[in-house]
C-alpha cells in the first residue's frame, strides 16, 4: 500500500484550512479526554467507516465534532464526550501554558511529550535548553552556579573559609542560585506565549513553585505540575535507563544521588506550599492520566459557554 492510499478521502473543512480526516488525530483527542488509547482508535476507525459508508467526502469540523460527541453519548461515554468538547473549545480560545517540574531523573520530559501529544500542543521546551541560552548571555564569572548541574551548583558558591562546606543548606542554596537566572528565560517564554496566544509545555528541574513570579500562580491558563519519585530504587533505575540512550554518565548521577534527593524533596515542599499538585511518577500512563485530570479541571474554569453550542472541533 502506498502512502497516498493511506490518506483518507474524507476532507475535514474549516474556516482557515481543509485537511484529510485523521484517525490518529481523533484518537489522540479522545485519549486526552480520558478514553483508553485502544478504545479511542477503535472508535475513530468506526467513525471513519461510517462516513465512508454514507459516502461523505467533505465534512465541517463542527459537524464532525457533533458526530463524535453523539457517538460517545450513544456508547455511554457521556463524561468523555463532555471532556472532548471542553478540550477542543479551550485550546482553540486560550493559550495554555503547562509547567512540568521535578528533580533530575523523575521523568519530566517523558510526561511533557506525552501530554503534548494528547493535547495537540506543538511546542515542548526543556529548561536545560533555556539554561544553555542563558549561559551565552551571562558570564561564568558573574554566575558560576549557572555553569554547573543543578546538583553540583553548590560547589561554585563563593564561601568563607569558616563556612561549612558540604551541607544540605549549601546544596539547596546552590540549586536556588542555579535556577534563578533560568527562571528569567522561563518567565519570558510564558509572557510571550500569553501575548501571542500560543500554547506551550515547559519541563525541567528549573520549574520551582515559589521561586517563579507570584502572578503566574494565579493565572488560570498557567498550570503547574510537579513530578516526584519516592522510591530510591525506582529513581536510580530511571538514571540507568537514561544512560543507555544518552551520553549522560550514570556514575555522575549516582555519585550525587543524595543531593538529587534533597533537591527533589525541596521542590515537593515548595509545590505543597504553593498548592501545586505533586504526582508520583511510577507509571507513565497513570501519571499522564492524572495530569490530564488536573488540566481538565483547570479547563473547566476557563470554559464560559454551554458545551453543545460550541462551534469548535
From Swiss-Prot:
Q: List the disulfide bonds.
A: none
Broad EC category? transferase
Which Gene3D superfamilies does this chain map to? P-loop containing nucleotide triphosphate hydrolases
Give one GO molecular function term.
phosphotransferase activity, carboxyl group as acceptor
Q: Where is the ATP-cone domain?
A: 8-95
Which keywords annotate this record? Answer: ATP-binding, Kinase, Nucleotide-binding, Transferase
Q: Which cofactor does it need?
A: a divalent metal cation
* Pathway it works in: Thermoadapter biosynthesis; cyclic 2,3-diphosphoglycerate biosynthesis; cyclic 2,3-diphosphoglycerate from 2-phospho-D-glycerate: step 1/2
Instruction: Provide the catalytic activity annotation.
Output: (2R)-2-phosphoglycerate + ATP = (2R)-2,3-bisphosphoglycerate + ADP + H(+)
Asked whether the UniProt record includes Transferase among its keywords, one would answer: yes
Alphabetical list of PROSITE patterns matching this protein: ATP_CONE (PS51161)
EC number per UniProt: 2.7.2.16
InterPro entries per the record?
A: 2PKG (IPR020872), ATP-cone_dom (IPR005144), P-loop_NTPase (IPR027417)
Q: Which family does it belong to?
A: Belongs to the 2-phosphoglycerate kinase family.
Described by its record, this protein's role is as follows:
Catalyzes the phosphorylation of 2-phosphoglycerate to 2,3-diphosphoglycerate. Involved in the biosynthesis of cyclic 2,3-bisphosphoglycerate, a thermoprotectant.
Q: What is this protein called?
A: 2-phosphoglycerate kinase
Q: Which organism is it from?
A: Methanococcus maripaludis (strain C6 / ATCC BAA-1332)
Amino acid at each position: 500500500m502506498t502512502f497516498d492510499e493511506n490518506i483518507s478521502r474524507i476532507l475535514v473543512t474549516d474556516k482557515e484550512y481543509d485537511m484529510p480526516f485523521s484517525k490518529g488525530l481523533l484518537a489522540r483527542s479522545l485519549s486526552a479526554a480520558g478514553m483508553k488509547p485502544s478504545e479511542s482508535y477503535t472508535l475513530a476507525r468506526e467513525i471513519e467507516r461510517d462516513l465512508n459508508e454514507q459516502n461523505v467526502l467533505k465534512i465541517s469540523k463542527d459537524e464532525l465534532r457533533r458526530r463524535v460527541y453523539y457517538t460517545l453519548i450513544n456508547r455511554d461515554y457521556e463524561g468523555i464526550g463532555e471532556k472532548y468538547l471542553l478540550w477542543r473549545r479551550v485550546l482553540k480560545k486560550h493559550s495554555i501554558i503547562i509547567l512540568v517540574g521535578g528533580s533530575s531523573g523523575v521523568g519530566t520530559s517523558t510526561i511533557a511529550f506525552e501530554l503534548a501529544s494528547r493535547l495537540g500542543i506543538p511546542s515542548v521546551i526543556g529548561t536545560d535548553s533555556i539554561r544553555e541560552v542563558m549561559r551565552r548571555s551571562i558570564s561564568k564569572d558573574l554566575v558560576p552556579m549557572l555553569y554547573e548541574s543543578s546538583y553540583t551548583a553548590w560547589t561554585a558558591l563563593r564561601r568563607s573559609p569558616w563556612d561549612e562546606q558540604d551541607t544540605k543548606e549549601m546544596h539547596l542554596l546552590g540549586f536556588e542560585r542555579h535556577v534563578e537566572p533560568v527562571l528569567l528565560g522561563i518567565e519570558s517564554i510564558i509572557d510571550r506565549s500569553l501575548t501571542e496566544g500560543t500554547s506551550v509545555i515547559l519541563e525541567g528541574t528549573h520549574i520551582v513553585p515559589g521561586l517563579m513570579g507570584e502572578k503566574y500562580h494565579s493565572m488560570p491558563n498557567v498550570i503547574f505540575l510537579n513530578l516526584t519519585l519516592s522510591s530510591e530504587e525506582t529513581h536510580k533505575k530511571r538514571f540507568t535507563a537514561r544512560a543507555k540512550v544518552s551520553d549522560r554518565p550514570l556514575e555522575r548521577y549516582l555519585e550525587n544521588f543524595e543531593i538529587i534527593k534533597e533537591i527533589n524533596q525541596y521542590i515537593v515542599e515548595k509545590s505543597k506550599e504553593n498548592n501545586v499538585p505533586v504526582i508520583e511518577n511510577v507509571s507513565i500512563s497513570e501519571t499522564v492520566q492524572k495530569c490530564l485530570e488536573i488540566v481538565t479541571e483547570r479547563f473547566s474554569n476557563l470554559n464560559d459557554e454551554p458545551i453543545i453550542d460550541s462551534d469548535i472541533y
